[in-house]
Amino acid sequence: GCALVGSIAGVLFAGKLSDRYGRKVTMLIAALFFSVSGIGCAITGSFDQLVIARILGGVGIGVVSIVSPLYISEVSIARYRGRLVSLYQLAVTLGFLGAYLANYQLLHFSQSGAILGDGWMHTIFVSEVWRGMLGLSSVPSLLFFVVVLFIPESPRWLVLRNCDERALGVFQRIYLSTQEAQTQLEETKSVVQSEAKSDWKFLLQPGIFKAVLIGAAIAILGQFMGVNAVLYYGPSIFEEAGLSGGDALFSQVLVGLVNAVTTVIAVFIIDKVGRKKLVYYGVSGMVLSLLLIGFYFRFSISLGLPNNFLLFFFLFYVFCCAISISAVIFVLLSEMYPTRIRGMAMSIAGFALWVGTYLVGQLTPWMLQNLTPAGTFLLFAIMCVPYILIVWKLIPETTGKSLEEIERYWMKK
């Protein structure tokens, strides 16, 4: 809960920070928050210190969840942008998997009778192994910091700051052609110069404000379509269906594997199939699977349905979700908004997303108890309908379009 609170706080200032100081500097700051959090959790001397360390880590998560896909979008060639931004979601998925495996190994090590002396190593990795589990996050955090040191600043942000020569140099590294780089620089400058100078004035222009509202809507609606309920409460839901604790945990491992493998597939097809088609197919499959999961909980006893029925449609739901909204959401949010207010607008959408995550996390146990599992999954299915309507009616297909082309679309609305 502490990390989630920190994440909500982080997204609030991530966009403004990245718009003012640059994408690279903001990611470096987030990496420092990660590192301090991991080390702080490992050596904390009190519960209050642990809470503070977790909140700091959450702030870093919130910042990176906005700025990383934003940066990838701004340094990507249009025809590969969807694939490259989707790598962010893949990295998150693999990060979760890596954390699960690392924690499992640490727990196994601590229970194996290993002795690391009587000092702090024994405390962190054996007697109080939770310190090692939380502290290990400082390793990828420091690696992230080092990697970001060597990447270029976003060329579109550099144009916004009138650093045309530096921007041209970055475009040349991206396009490997001086002529293409010069053309992209001129197109970016043309669009930026047509924007209002005041960020808030520009954000409140009818077309741009519409894009911001749409982004926030799909961000929060996506959380109420059940994905985090499945990922957070999967074992409890499986036990509710009659599986033993061990079988429930094994089923959740299968959920995680399907999520990871499907995300890899999404990375390779998102620029070929298109963002909107993936949403149409994926969300339609989600509705079907959610209805059948609800059907199982309502009629499994009277019809004698096996537990494998539930497991199959759980996995099918995760497949449909991972190949559509999970892969597409950060791609759309990172390319929908104009350069001048991209960070600010993504912060608004990110805030909606994290608030939705928090609400679903808090409400799911209540819904499972009071609405019953059948009613809960029926509600998730109903929430898919406005999502797919918004994507169908209000969002343009952005596949293969430059960020400047997308910006012109919204400015004309």
Role assignments for model-derived ranges:
Residues 1-166, 170-171, 192-413:
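Alpha-helical transmembrane bundle of multi-pass membrane proteins
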Residues 178-190:
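Short, well-structured alpha-helical segments
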